[in-house]
Amino acid sequence: MRWDFVRLGIGALAIVTTVVEVVSAGQTRSLVDEPGTWKPWKPFAAIASARQERAATPALVKAFEGELLALNTILRRATAVASPKGFSVETWGNLAGYRPTEHAPGQPAAAELPLAGGLTFGAFPIFEYQRNGKTIREDTGETELQLFLVNQIGRGVIDSGNVPEWGSIDHDAFLQPLPIGEVAGLPRYGDGLVIARDPAALWTPLSLRAALDIVGKARQLEVDGLEQNVKAVTARLAVVRDPAARAKRLKDAEAAAATMPNPQAFVKQIEESIRVEEAALVKELSPTAGAGKGLIDARKALAEVTDWIAALSPAEQAAPSCYTAKGGTLRGKFRAAPSAGCHPLVRPNYSYFNKTLPRSSPQVVIITPVARCFDTSNKYNREANSPSPAGCRANRALIETMDTNAIRAWLR
């Protein structure tokens, strides 16, 4: 699963453009006590690729938008933002895309999962400025957006990122978002607030075998790349050493040197370049340097993984896994969980979703980001500590006063 930022990206571009235009027009004045408005719901963003990836009919997309509109109605009742002052509110929704992941055993087809997407809340500051002798008032500009992600529980939502040893392999595993207390009565996991029947059940442990399989695929990819490199260098060395090819290069050099002031010097220069190239290619293939050494090391690293997997018993392979970057060796970094100082590894728990419900039904909401606006104790966090009533302050007010019971009732 992935969060589709197409709509957000366009909005952000428009926001930045507006700010530049306003600043260039003259000095702005924030109107922190000016009443604002909740603007009408913006057109729902459900691009063709997302609809296709989600196997979503127009009727299903419309029903999903209806659910987001119901959530929007609940948010509008939040007492601290119901009658905005110093800012105006814009909200919009989107349908997120979905694609099969290359290394994700058992990942369901899109039609077996509920639709996913999100609602974006933005509190935009009210300000005015002078242009051509006229006072212009606007409620646009740049702000910190608050996302309400619906039915999105996969990698890249609120987790801590990829494991370095997994490289660029396309997979759906990640470091489990860990519980970090509560915010406004909602459990915080990683950088998100989770509203669900059982937040901890959104993810399922990744087995040690599965974690090592991804490492093995990443290392196999490195071996394949180095083998191709060595193959290309070997082929080039054969050409450089080929007597016929060398004779042709020297003959061409002699022909080119015929009109030069010192033809013999030019030919010697070409002979030297051939010698230098041959030496460089030989060094590149050496077992002590270059691609030759890299391939030997990569094969050893791959064998380290495959040999470890082969030595594991079935029970050890099936054990939940965890990861610690401070482990030093591969066996120190990947361990069976639980282990002190070791971060659990997980996958999305696709079976969390109730398949008997309509695919448009909301079953989980994750509010993110959290640290950007709630980490007020960090004096370097300018957004969280901004005096503006818009942006982070409005986001906090929304979350602190919204009817969470109504949101829970809205979830299926």
Q: Residues of each region from the PLM?
A:
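Bacterial N-terminal signal peptides that target proteins for export
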Residues: 1-10
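Boundary at the C-terminal end of the N-terminal hydrophobic targeting segment
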Residues: 24-28
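Short, solvent-exposed recognition patches
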Residues: 48-361, 370
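Surface-exposed amphipathic alpha-helical segments
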Residues: 376-412
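Acidic/histidine-rich, surface-exposed loop or edge segments in extracytoplasmic proteins
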Residues: 29-51, 363-387
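Bacterial N-terminal signal peptides
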Residues: 9-21
